[in-house]
C-alpha cells in the first residue's frame, strides 16, 4: 500500500490481509485547547475558521460526517508561515471524513477515509467481514467466497473466567495478574496491552513480527477500544441514526459458534463492528506463534471466546468488584 494509488490503476490487485484493519487505523485526535488557540490567533482562512467553530460547538459524544478540505503543500506552507500556533494535526483534521467529540478527554477524534483504486481486487483473509466491506465500499460490488478454515496444528487454551479488560487488570494490579498467569503458563512470552509493558509486541502492534514462531505464548487481555472510537467508525460507515443513544451494556451475543455475554451495543451493525475489532486483535496476537502450522500452545486470558479454543472457566484471579465481570460471566456453545 506504499505505492501511489494511481500507479495501481491498470492492475488487478491481490491483498493477502484484511485491508479494513489498516484502513480503520487512519484516525487521530487533536486537543480542544489547540483548536481554540488556532481560533484565537485569527490567522486561519475563513473556511477553516468556520469549520473549527462548528466543531467546537459539538455536544459530547456527538459524531458528524465532514466534507474534507484538501490542502496542497503550498497551502500547508502558507499556514505554517503564519506562526507557531498552527497545529501539525490540523491538515489531518481538515482532510478527515468523520469526527467525534470527546469532551471528557478534551479532544476531537477524526477519521480519514482512504478510497482504493476502482479496480478488481481480491482480498484473501480469514477475518474479512462482509457487512463491514459493504459499509466501507457501498458503491462497489462485493462477492464473498467462504472456504473451510484450516485446523490449528497447535493448541489454543483459553481461560475465560475474567474479563481481562484494562480496568480489570488495573484494579487487581498488573504485577498480581501476570504473576498468577505465569503460575499457569510458566515463563513464556506475553502479548497484552501496551500499558502492561511486556515487550515490543502488544495489541494494536502485532503485524510483521515472527520472533514467536513455534513458541508457546500467552495472550492476555480483551482489547476493547473506547466506545467513542466505535461510534466514530460507525459514523463513517453510515450506521449512526439521529436522536439515538448508543451505549455499552452487558448483552448476550451469538458469534462464531459461541453464545456469551459481553459489554456491547444494542445496534447490530455497531455491535458487529465492535466484535470484529476485538476478535481480530485477539486472532492477530494468537497468530504470532504460527499456531496454524506449528505444534505450539497459545494460552489466552480473555472473556471473548476465540475460535478453536479449549475453554476453561476456572477462576484464577483474586475476587474483585468488577461490575463488567459480575454482569458478563457466561460463555457457552451456540
Language model regions located:
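ASCE RecA-like P-loop NTPase motor cores
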Residues: 1-334
Amino acid at each position: 500500500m506504499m505505492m501511489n494509488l494511481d500507479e495501481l490503476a491498470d492492475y488487478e490487485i491481490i491483498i493477502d490481509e484484511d485491508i479494513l484493519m489498516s484502513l480503520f487505523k487512519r484516525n487521530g485526535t487533536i486537543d480542544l485547547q489547540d483548536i481554540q488557540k488556532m481560533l484565537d490567533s485569527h490567522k486561519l482562512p475563513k473556511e477553516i475558521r468556520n469549520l473549527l467553530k462548528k466543531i467546537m460547538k459539538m455536544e459530547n459524544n456527538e459524531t458528524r460526517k465532514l466534507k474534507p478540505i484538501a490542502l496542497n503543500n503550498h497551502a500547508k506552507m502558507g499556514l505554517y508561515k503564519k506562526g507557531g500556533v498552527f497545529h501539525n494535526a490540523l491538515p489531518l483534521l481538515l482532510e478527515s471524513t468523520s469526527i467525534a467529540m470527546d469532551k471528557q478527554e478534551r479532544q476531537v477524534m477524526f477519521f480519514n477515509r482512504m478510497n482504493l483504486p476502482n479496480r478488481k481486487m481480491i482480498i484473501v483473509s480469514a477475518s474479512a467481514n462482509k457487512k463491514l466491506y459493504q459499509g466501507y465500499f457501498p458503491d462497489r460490488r462485493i462477492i464473498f467466497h467462504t472456504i473451510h478454515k484450516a485446523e490449528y496444528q497447535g493448541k489454543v487454551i483459553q481461560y475465560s473466567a475474567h474479563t481481562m479488560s484494562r480496568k480489570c487488570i488495573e484494579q487487581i494490579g498488573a504485577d498480581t495478574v501476570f504473576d498468577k498467569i505465569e503460575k499457569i503458563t510458566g515463563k513464556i512470552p506475553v502479548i497484552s496491552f501496551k500499558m502492561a509493558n511486556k515487550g515490543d509486541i502488544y495489541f494494536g502492534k502485532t503485524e510483521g513480527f515472527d520472533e514467536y514462531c513455534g513458541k508457546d505464548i500467552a495472550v492476555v487481555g480483551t482489547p476493547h477500544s473506547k466506545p467513542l472510537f466505535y461510534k466514530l467508525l460507525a459514523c463513517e460507515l453510515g450506521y449512526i441514526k439521529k436522536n439515538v443513544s448508543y451505549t455499552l451494556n452487558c448483552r448476550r451475543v451469538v458469534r462464531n459458534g459461541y453464545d456469551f455475554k459481553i459489554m456491547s451495543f444494542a445496534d447490530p451493525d455497531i455491535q458487529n463492528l465492535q466484535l470484529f475489532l476485538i476478535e481480530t486483535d485477539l486472532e492477530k496476537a494468537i497468530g504470532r506463534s504460527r499456531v496454524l502450522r506449528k505444534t505450539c500452545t497459545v494460552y489466552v486470558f480473555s472473556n471473548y471466546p476465540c475460535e478453536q479454543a479449549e475453554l476453561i472457566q476456572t477462576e484464577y484471579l483474586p475476587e474483585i468488584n468488577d461490575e463488567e465481570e459480575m454482569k458478563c460471566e457466561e460463555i457457552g456453545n451456540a
